[in-house]
A protein has these predicted regions:
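C-terminal membrane-cytosol helix-exit motif in multi-pass small-molecule transporters
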Residues: 3-26
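C-terminal ends and interior cores of transmembrane alpha-helices
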Residues: 122-135
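Short amphipathic helix-loop junctions that connect adjacent transmembrane helices
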Residues: 69-85
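Juxtamembrane intracellular "pre-TM" segments in multi-pass secondary transporters
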Residues: 18-53
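Helix-to-loop junctions at the C-terminal end of transmembrane segments
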Residues: 98-112
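Pair of pore-lining "gating" transmembrane helices in MFS-fold secondary transporters
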Residues: 45-63, 146
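Intracellular juxtamembrane helix-capping segments at the cytosolic ends
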Residues: 154-167
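A late C-terminal transmembrane helix in Major Facilitator Superfamily
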Residues: 170-190
Length: 190
């Protein structure tokens, strides 16, 4: 893993141009005055696209967390080994992150709302596949959890892009913070 991290660092250092850190330092930063968080929340509340974006992110996260957390427990009840459980969760994580660039490109090509819809449909399919799988059927659970991760990726990436497009520049950071808060509270409550 250290070798992979070192290689990734070298690739990023060589090919990431322009450096986002340097670009950010050159641009003027809009600072929110005290009380502007309330204005940002009001801006989101009055913006149907922003609300839809945050809702889709939260729904995707609740579905993902609920199924992801319970699957290892379900498998352990019939004495599936930790190695197999770990493999199923690894396949899930692959679904969450491996196709992120593709999901972003699809979001640009097909539109944010369409990719969110695809994500919700994928999440629904994943719960059906996982829900009907036997606890010792690692293959079917792996497929279900892969789809779960992929659906989550679709709702999160397209939802975040839609949110960013839907709010004024002055409210982008506060809106993303509100989205993260809602997403994580929803996941904890789900």
């Amino acid at each position: 893993s250290a070798t992979t991290l070192a290689l990734a660092t070298i690739v990023i250092a060589m090919f990431l141009r322009p450096d986002p850190y340097l670009v950010a330092n050159k641009e003027s930063v809009t600072k929110l005055a005290k009380g502007d968080t309330k204005k940002a929340l009001k801006h989101i509340r009055n913006n149907p696209k922003a609300l839809f974006a945050i809702l889709s992110i939260a729904i995707g996260h609740v579905a993902m967390v609920s199924v992801m957390v319970m699957t290892p427990v379900h498998m352990a009840h019939v004495d599936v080994t930790l190695t197999v459980i770990g493999l199923v969760i690894s396949i899930h994580v692959l679904g969450m992150y491996a196709f992120s660039p593709l999901v972003g490109a699809l979001s640009d090509r097909l539109g944010r709302i369409r990719v969110i819809q695809i994500g919700i449909a994928t999440l629904l399919l994943s719960t059906i596949v996982s829900g009907f799988a036997r606890a010792d059927d690692a293959y079917t659970l792996g497929v279900g959890l892969f789809l779960l991760g992929l659906g989550w990726s679709c709702t999160l990436i397209a939802g975040s892009a839609l949110l960013s497009e839907s709010v004024e520049s002055a409210f982008k950071a506060s809106s993303q913070g509100a989205s993260d808060l809602v997403m994580n509270l929803s996941g904890a409550a789900g």
